Amino acid sequence: MRQIAIYGKGGIGKSTTTQNLTAALATMGNKILLVGCDPKADSTRMLLGGLNQKTVLDTLRSEGDEGVNLDVVVQPGFGNIKCVESGGPEPGVGCAGRGIITSIGLLENLGAYTEDLDYVFYDVLGDVVCGGFAMPIREGKAKEIYIVASGELMAIYAANNICKGLAKFAKGGARLGGIICNSRNVDGERELLEAFAKKLGSQLIHFVPRDNIVQRAEINRKTVIDFDPESNQAKEYLTLASNVQNNTKLVVPTPLPMEELEAMMVEFGIVEL
């Protein structure tokens, strides 16, 4: 069982990428559990045809410990992917990071991590790797980390910060598998992210081009893999899935000092002096 966490700054398309990646892996015959670790609870929506899933924390609040069972919090989605949303605290109360810790602990106790699973994916809110959101890394749950980024300053800044957290908790066994580019059609984007990944000691695992079919699929509450499996974009996600499946390059990243990061952005014309 490979346990993989997907990080990336808010709004980068992390949940969209994760759902299309897991859908592609499922069509390749893999058995998958996807745990959404974002208080917005939107990590599984397209796999469930738009169904707003009841979260682990909502169930805990309304039913108590006794009311939480796998039938309530685990829903089968596209490709028979087991879908879970950890949820978050009520707005303004409590810590969402603690919620992830509670949810994963509950899933373990309830026996969600069955031996027949090929993959467990964690879709994690990742602008800031605070203690709770770092939990899949820190506790050694996820051994493989992929970061979704684009050729924009804040996306790369967030990716570098995530690598700082990953390097700090490397003793738990977590390693960076690579950078996934979710393209924003920025000039020189592929070359920039290849250079950034190389400086980290890692790789650009795949460059996912921008295509409006992603939005059309989302409007229809489906992944691209489900909505139009013959499309070019579906083939891109299948290539990403194949690259992840065959990836053996797992490293402790070397985050860039801020001066070097800014110099690289200037070199590629993303930032002007």
Curated annotation (Swiss-Prot):
Its EC number is 1.18.6.1. [4Fe-4S] cluster binds at C95, C130. The keyword Iron-sulfur applies. Transmembrane segments: none annotated. Its cofactor is [4Fe-4S] cluster. The modification ADP-ribosylarginine is found at R98. ATP binds at G8, K9, G10, G11, I12, G13, K14, S15. It catalyses: N2 + 8 reduced [2Fe-2S]-[ferredoxin] + 16 ATP + 16 H2O = H2 + 8 oxidized [2Fe-2S]-[ferredoxin] + 2 NH4(+) + 16 ADP + 16 phosphate + 6 H(+). GO terms for biological process: nitrogen fixation. GO terms for molecular function: 4 iron, 4 sulfur cluster binding; ATP binding; metal ion binding; nitrogenase activity. Keywords: 4Fe-4S, ADP-ribosylation, ATP-binding, Iron, Iron-sulfur, Metal-binding, Nitrogen fixation, Nucleotide-binding, Oxidoreductase. CDD domains: NifH. Binds 1 [4Fe-4S] cluster per dimer. The reversible ADP-ribosylation of Arg-98 inactivates the nitrogenase reductase and regulates nitrogenase activity. It comes from the Archaea. The key enzymatic reactions in nitrogen fixation are catalyzed by the nitrogenase complex, which has 2 components: the iron protein and the molybdenum-iron protein. Belongs to the NifH/BchL/ChlL family. Homodimer. This is Nitrogenase iron protein. The gene is nifH.
